[in-house]
């Protein structure tokens, strides 16, 4: 049986590492022991990915990356390290190679169908 991976959590743009506190507690109760929330500097995607890569490099075994919102773009950029075994996206950006989170949000959304009940609620 393989070793349990270290789990590294990357927060969203308006968050911080501390926002993962309840998730870390819940995962700990489920038996996960090696849990880390990376504090992203939020200066650029490149800087945030580099900070995450540094945390990945500090781990001796397999790593599972989890990204929420903007953190999804970060783990996409940082997740090509040899010891990364998987990427988990939670309501997150999952950009294609070379695509930025900003590019995703600027896409033409005019083709999205909004259902009638949603329109009635003013959404």
Language-model features: locations:
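Active-site catalytic motif of lipid deacylating hydrolases and related acyltransferases
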Residues: 2-61
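Histidine-centered divalent metal-coordination motifs
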Residues: 11, 68, 113
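A short beta-to-alpha transition loop/helix N-cap that caps and shapes the active-site region
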Residues: 16, 45-47, 93-106
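Hydrophobic packing residues within well-ordered alpha-helices of enzyme cores
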Residues: 20, 75-78, 123
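Short, glycine/charged-enriched secondary-structure capping and boundary segments
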Residues: 22-24, 51-52, 78-84, 101-106
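Conserved hydrolase catalytic core segment
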Residues: 64-98
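Single conserved hydrophobic/aromatic residue that forms the stacking wall/gate
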Residues: 112-117, 121-123
């Amino acid at each position: 049986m393989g070793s349990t991976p270290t789990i590294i959590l990357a927060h969203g743009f308006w968050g911080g590492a501390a926002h993962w506190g309840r998730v870390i507690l819940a995962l700990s109760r489920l038996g996960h022991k090696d849990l880390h929330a990376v504090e992203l500097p939020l200066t650029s995607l490149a800087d945030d990915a580099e900070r995450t890569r540094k945390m990945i490099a500090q781990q001796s075994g397999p790593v599972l990356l989890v990204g929420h919102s903007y953190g999804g773009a970060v783990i996409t950029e940082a997740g090509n390290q040899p010891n990364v075994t998987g990427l988990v996206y939670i309501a997150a950006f999952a950009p294609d190679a070379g695509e930025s989170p900003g590019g995703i949000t600027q896409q033409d959304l005019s083709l999205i169908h909004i259902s009638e009940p949603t329109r009635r609620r003013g959404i």
